[in-house]
Amino acid sequence: MSEFFHISVLLRECLDGLDIKPDGIYVDGTLGGAGHSSQIAKRLTTGRLIGIDRDPIALKAAGERLKPFENNVTLVHSNFCEIAQVLQDLNVSGVDGILLDLGVSSPQLDDAARGFSYMMDAPLDMRMNSQDTLDAYQVVNTWSQEELRRILYTYGEERYAPQIAAAICRRRAEKPIETTLQLVDVIRSAMPPAALREKQHPAKRSFQAIRIAVNDELGSVEKVMRDAIPLLNPGGRLAIITFHSLEDRIVKLGMAEAAKGCTCPPSFPVCVCGKKPKVKLISRKPIVASDEELEANPRSRSAKLRVCEKL
């Protein structure tokens, strides 16, 4: 279990946001090291926790941590975006809370062999699920220059995307780019000296972009925003932690759309559109880490929690 130790971000805020009932049914769609889940399970008596993770290593570690609660816990190896299918397979028609902690976890970042980190040398991989076929090596060495430019700009918000994409294509024409530090070297070579002196690591945005592409992270968030709310019982809550603006935008817009009621013009004497809000927002603004948490866990700095409740 020590191989997958992960400090849970916004733990107290998530538990408050989910408003856990001892007899409720809850889903942790991004189980990880079960930091959030172990605290949810601790609060259940006759309730049930369904834990989902696409990473088999995380799932195994979570199983160990959740052993004291095994009578109340069901673990499933799947992607959180398949939550509707998972619940259907388990004959669960509705749940009282869904928690998603998006992005890559600390153990995945810290395990050099996984290829997520630009600080340690490893084969280009970046798969959250090692059984998936697409990896970072394929993206870097086989995708077209235009495809690379697009993901670097769109997913990494990298201003030097055209230069980096061109540099990758030039280097791989000589020989394949096989490791993380080889890729870092290519990225550095494409950036002007001023950019290399910035506080942020020059490869951070590019690595984020490639990781998002490999794991279809934004597609998964878009799908779960369509599917999760209908799965909630009335009064059930959806709590989602994001770590970058692209994910947060999808979650923010998805919740705002679900919270919208009548869209008729103010001049209409009665509603003719028939639209009713599906949820209410628990907080208009995202919940962020406290100063104490930031000091204890600097990785929580970019975390944003949004919560809504099914009407």
What are these regions (language model features)?
Residues 1-311:
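S-adenosyl-L-methionine-dependent methyltransferase catalytic core, i.e., the SAM/SAH-binding region
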